[in-house]
UniProtKB/Swiss-Prot annotation:
Antimicrobial protein. Has antibacterial activity against the Gram-positive bacterium M.luteus (MIC=55.0 uM). Lacks antibacterial activity against the Gram-positive bacteria B.circulans, and L.monocytogenes, and the Gram-negative bacteria E.coli D31 and E.coli ATCC 25922. Has antifungal activity against P.pastoris (MIC=16.5 uM), Z.marxianus (MIC=16.5 uM), S.pombe (MIC=11.0 uM), and C.wickerhami (MIC=16.5 uM), but lacks antifungal activity against A.niger and C.albidus. Residues 1-37 are annotated as: Disordered. It comes from the Eukaryota. Induction: By bacterial infection. Residues 20-29 have a biased composition (Polar residues). GO terms for biological process: defense response to fungus; defense response to Gram-positive bacterium; innate immune response; killing of cells of another organism. Keywords: Antibiotic, Antimicrobial, Fungicide, Immunity, Innate immunity, Secreted. It is found in: Secreted. One of its GO terms (cellular component) is extracellular space. This is Proline-rich antimicrobial peptide 1.
Length: 37
């Protein structure tokens, strides 16, 4: 499991979204980056 302070663990939905949308090339850690202060 991925444990990152201040961020919830990636859910099944977080993982599957980039898979069905070929236009989404953003990596998980980059997507979560907007939530960091």
């Amino acid at each position: 499991d991925i444990q990152i302070p201040g961020i919830k663990k990636p859910t099944h939905r977080d993982i599957i979204i980039p898979n069905w949308n070929p236009n989404v090339r953003t990596q998980p850690w980059q997507r979560f980056g907007g939530n960091k202060s």
